[in-house]
Amino acid sequence: AKARSVTESILVKNPNIKAVFGSNDNMALGAIQAIKDAGMKNVVVVGFDATPDAAKSILAGDMTATIAQSSYNMGALGVRHALDLANGKKIAANIDTGTELVTKKNAKKYK
């Protein structure tokens, strides 16, 4: 509900907006509702987390995309690097655990 109302306020000030990025899928889904309520079309909406609701929204043609994180890699690499640190080893400051762009082409596997 908050993302919807925040997006409504943004759309009043920016009626020609072309794209919205939600920090998570629930925010993106709220933005989609505000965009629909405003009667706007062709606004690119991208979320983050690849939730089943986002996948359904993508397949329905409402959300453009979402970004999936690799929870397996986050867990496995997190444990591995925690053990490395506990054993006095140095680890990289940043560790890429991987992401995947979810679009209509691959959204079915996230439903």
Tell where the protein language model's regions lie, with residue ranges.
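A residue-level marker of the well-folded mature domains of exported/periplasmic proteins
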Residues: 1-111
